[in-house]
């Protein structure tokens, strides 16, 4: 039995998220069906980060086991031929049998993309959040300082979150402006359900001047979801990277745009 790693890109608009669901199409279901056909056996995959409905990925990492004798090209080109246009395998490699894309991961990186312009863009409308009011990046980055380190993020988890603990360790949280785009890059060991989108919703209030940077600290310490702002929309969020002890994968979405 061999263990294979796949680097996946997908556009999440047409899916209920990564995880297989009985009532709606999922990225996992589409991938497993295509892999199973190439392998001529049932294939189940594990992913580094389960994205929600409408969320995208430029570098999702999955692994699966198979005893099917197939060249690496079959796992990429063959499977890609069976996948829909909004899901594609970028790379494939054989890895140690102990490798697990979820549990071996050290940290994960997400980008949230904001199109900050007076006029909306027909081209980017489905790829990023449009905000027509000017955002104060400096204040947003001041607020981000309060998010670093291992903390209780109860104020930024959804009511449906099933995690056993609200504690997460954030190593990086930063807004970067590139032209009309503003990119929120966040790196952490793991994230709670809707955590990043809830953070973005609150940080936008700071950027628009409705709250001070220190307000984020107050919300964090409250450990109460009702004290934070509304959840930012899903279509601006991208899973862009994973770091493992021996290698890492990262494809920042803004570098694909610009």
UniProtKB/Swiss-Prot annotation:
Active-site residues per Swiss-Prot or TrEMBL entry: 52
EC numbers for this chain: 5.4.99.12
GO MF term (any one): tRNA pseudouridine(38-40) synthase activity
Protein residues bound to substrate: 110
Catalytic function, reaction form: uridine(38/39/40) in tRNA = pseudouridine(38/39/40) in tRNA
A GO BP annotation: tRNA pseudouridine synthesis
Keyword Isomerase tagged: yes
Family: Belongs to the tRNA pseudouridine synthase TruA family.
NCBIfam families in the cross-refs: hisT_truA
Function: Formation of pseudouridine at positions 38, 39 and 40 in the anticodon stem and loop of transfer RNAs.
Name of the protein this chain belongs to: tRNA pseudouridine synthase A
């Amino acid at each position: 039995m061999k263990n294979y790693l796949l680097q996946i890109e997908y556009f999440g608009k047409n899916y209920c998220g990564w995880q297989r669901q009985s009532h709606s199409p999922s990225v996992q279901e589409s991938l497993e069906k295509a892999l199973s056909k190439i392998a001529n056996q049932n294939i189940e995959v594990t992913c580094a980060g389960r994205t929600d409905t409408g969320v995208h990925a430029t570098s999702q990492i999955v692994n699966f086991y198979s005893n099917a004798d197939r060249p690496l090209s079959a796992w990429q080109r063959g499977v890609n031929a069976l996948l829909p246009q909004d899901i594609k395998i970028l790379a494939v490699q054989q890895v140690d049998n102990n490798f697990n894309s979820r549990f071996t991961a050290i940290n994960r990186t997400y980008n949230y993309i904001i199109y900050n312009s007076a006029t909306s863009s027909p081209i980017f409308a489905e790829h990023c959040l449009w905000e027509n009011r000017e955002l104060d990046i400096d204040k947003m980055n001041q607020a981000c300082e309060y998010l670093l380190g291992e903390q209780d993020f109860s104020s930024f988890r959804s009511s449906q979150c099933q995690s056993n603990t609200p504690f997460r360790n954030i190593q990086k949280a930063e807004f970067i402006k590139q032209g009309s785009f503003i990119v929120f890059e966040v790196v952490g060991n793991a994230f709670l359900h809707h955590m990043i989108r809830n953070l973005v919703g609150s940080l936008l209030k700071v950027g628009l001047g409705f709250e001070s940077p220190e307000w984020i600290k107050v919300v964090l310490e409250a450990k109460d979801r009702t004290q934070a702002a509304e959840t930012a929309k899903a279509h601006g969020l991208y899973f862009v990277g994973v770091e493992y002890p021996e290698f890492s994968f990262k494809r920042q979405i803004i570098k694909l745009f610009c």
